[in-house]
């Protein structure tokens, strides 16, 4: 499942208008090299803490984890070598999207998302 998050925290963390994420089972994630660090983002619109994991060497965001989905990691798709298959299947926090961002017809958009940031 691939989605786009438009919450202000993801915008800041991505340094962009949104963050494109792919949900994967935690058991399927393998870190090939390096060490990650984590920032626990508790200043979210839902009040839930989002763990934002990033490369300890270069600072690139790798994935986010949320308490309501403990078995799923939300991988930042921009970290993948081939991003061609990551077309958005949904949008979350569309109420926070930048005014110039247009959402695709037929792709579900949730104004807010309980549990996710």
Segments predicted by a language model, with ranges:
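A short Gly-Trp-Pro
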Residues: 1-117
